[in-house]
Amino acid sequence: MGNGKFAARKLKRDANNNRWHDTGYARRQLGLDVKADPLEGAPQGRGIVLEKVGVEAKQPNSAIRKCVRVQLIKNGRQVTAFAVGDGAINFIDEHDEVEIEGIGGRLGRSKGDIPGVRFVVTKVNNVSLREMVTGRKEKPRR
């Protein structure tokens, strides 16, 4: 390792080469997380509901979390999204257009006791799901 008066170029080159041993740097530069992300790096995405599914909560909890299978419009990928709120699943029907966003787990993964679910439903047919659950808005008839 040079540390002399004129060693700056070698120091800089070595530092740049060694950055690739940092997993986070390498994944960022190669765009691996964006490639693997169904939303392709976007904060939200729209999709069509294929079916309603119940996902069993992980131990020690015991519940069936109400989710929906969604096919994204932009790339055709299928993801599972959680319907947040008491009775929220009743406002979602098959073939509805929903907007989803990340559930907020660490490193873009799932959160809490819902295994394999990385997204939440925010809107159904362009109306906020939360507003419908609280009773402020009605689901539009198509």
UniProtKB/Swiss-Prot annotation:
Stretches that traverse the bilayer: none
Cellular component terms (Gene Ontology): small ribosomal subunit
GO biological process: translation
Signal peptide interval: none
Pfam families per UniProt: Ribosom_S12_S23 (PF00164)
Record's keyword terms, sorted: Ribonucleoprotein, Ribosomal protein, RNA-binding, rRNA-binding
Top-rank taxon: Archaea
One term of GO molecular function: structural constituent of ribosome
InterPro entries: NA-bd_OB-fold, Ribosomal_uS12, Ribosomal_uS12_arc, Ribosomal_uS12_euk/arc
HAMAP family assigned: Ribosomal_uS12_A
NCBIfam families on file: PRK04211.1 (NF003254), uS12_E_A (TIGR00982)
Purpose of the protein: With S4 and S5 plays an important role in translational accuracy. Located at the interface of the 30S and 50S subunits.
Entry similarity comment: Belongs to the universal ribosomal protein uS12 family.
Protein name according to UniProt: Small ribosomal subunit protein uS12
Organism: Methanoculleus marisnigri (strain ATCC 35101 / DSM 1498 / JR1)
Phylogenetic classification of the source organism: Archaea, Methanobacteriati, Methanobacteriota, Stenosarchaea group, Methanomicrobia
